[in-house]
Amino acid sequence: MTHDNKLQVEAIKRGTVIDHIPAQVGFKLLTLFKLTATDQRITIGLNLPSNHLGRKDLIKIENIFLTEEQANQLAIYAPQATVNQIDDYDVVRKLVPTLPEHITGVLTCPNSNCISRSEPVSSSFSVKQRDGDVHLKCKYCEKEFERQAVLQDR
């Protein structure tokens, strides 16, 4: 909200608001997580001012509620995101995504020789956090990658 208390992105009556997405990541989330695979209205705010992040993206999806598992998968790209479930214009539940143990069917293995790139199988990674760094290990080629290596491949 701005200092004159006007909303920059219209409020929704019912649905999900994904807030505190790092700037320039909103479109990537929409694509990777197939958030546009609905006929419901989706509102996107890009490069909005944020006291916490400086700039942020925001996604509002009407009449759709993300599960806790779906929210946690967002933490790979947007570790500071919050997922708010809205009903009658009020936040009825706030999810703070945490890194999942596994992520399937979303990311692409950076190993060009991995079978997940050429065979009809869903990619699958185990997620490990060590010393503040996130590493993803491919189920198929068993190679481990830093989070940024997997994210840049997308």
From Swiss-Prot:
GO molecular function: metal ion binding
A cellular component term, taken from the record's GO annotations: aspartate carbamoyltransferase complex
Leader peptide range in chain numbering: none
The UniProt record lists the keyword Transferase: no
Cofactor(s) needed by this chain: Zn(2+)
UniProt xrefs under InterPro entries: Asp_carbamoyltransf_reg_N (IPR020545), Asp_carbamoylTrfase_reg (IPR002801), Asp_carbamoyltrfase_reg_C (IPR020542), Asp_carbatrfase_reg_C_sf (IPR036792), Asp_carbatrfase_reg_N_sf (IPR036793)
GO BP annotations listed: 'de novo' pyrimidine nucleobase biosynthetic process; pyrimidine nucleotide biosynthetic process
Keyword entries, A-Z: Metal-binding, Pyrimidine biosynthesis, Zinc
UniProt keyword annotation of DNA repair present: no
SUPFAM superfamilies per the UniProt record, alphabetical: Aspartate carbamoyltransferase, Regulatory-chain, C-terminal domain, Aspartate carbamoyltransferase, Regulatory-chain, N-terminal domain
Membrane spanning stretches: none
Binding site for Zn(2+): 109, 114, 138, 141
Cross-referenced PANTHER family: ASPARTATE CARBAMOYLTRANSFERASE REGULATORY CHAIN
Assembly notes: Contains catalytic and regulatory chains.
Family, as annotated: Belongs to the PyrI family.
Role, per record: Involved in allosteric regulation of aspartate carbamoyltransferase.
Protein name as catalogued: Aspartate carbamoyltransferase regulatory chain
